[in-house]
Curated annotation (Swiss-Prot):
Disulfide bridge map: none
GO annotation terms (biological process): carbon fixation; photosynthesis
Record's signal peptide: none
Organism: Thermosynechococcus vestitus (strain NIES-2133 / IAM M-273 / BP-1)
GO cellular component: carboxysome
Native organism taxonomy: Bacteria, Bacillati, Cyanobacteriota, Cyanophyceae, Acaryochloridales
Protein name: Carboxysome shell protein CcmK2
Impact when changing E95A: Form hexamers poorly
Biological role stated in the UniProt entry: Probably the major shell protein of the carboxysome, a polyhedral inclusion where RuBisCO (ribulose bisphosphate carboxylase, rbcL-rbcS) is sequestered. Assembles into hexamers which make sheets that form the facets of the polyhedral carboxysome. The hexamer central pore probably regulates metabolite flux.
Start and end residues of each BMC domain: 4-90
Length: 102
């Protein structure tokens, strides 16, 4: 089963926290991290089965938009990322998140 990567980029930290919370509650995904981009941009990253990641990203977008001042800047899902990406980008399952892995 392919392990997909889902990302939501927001403007503002409260919106990304709301998105992350909704994402892990809506589907069987694991939150693997977040990245502060600068200028108020923050990206949250989840991993899981393709259909679960799709559902979680949709839920995260809806929730982030409800935050006062929250703005979703971009979303993306990579269904089957190449294994090399895991060693270069911050999308790996780390020891800290392993206990939450489905």
């Amino acid at each position: 089963m392919p392990i997909a990567v889902g990302m939501i980029e927001t403007r503002g930290f409260p919106a990304v926290v709301e998105a992350a919370d909704a994402m892990v509650k809506a589907a069987r995904v694991t939150l693997v991290g977040y990245e502060k981009i600068g200028s108020g941009r923050v990206t949250v990253i989840v991993r899981g089965d393709v259909s679960e990641v799709q559902a979680s990203v949709a839920a995260g977008v809806d929730s982030a938009k409800r935050v006062n001042g929250g703005e979703v800047l971009s979303t993306h899902i990579i269904a089957r990322p190449h294994e090399n990406l895991e060693y270069v980008l911050p999308i790996r399952y780390t020891e800290a998140v392993e206990q939450f892995r489905n």
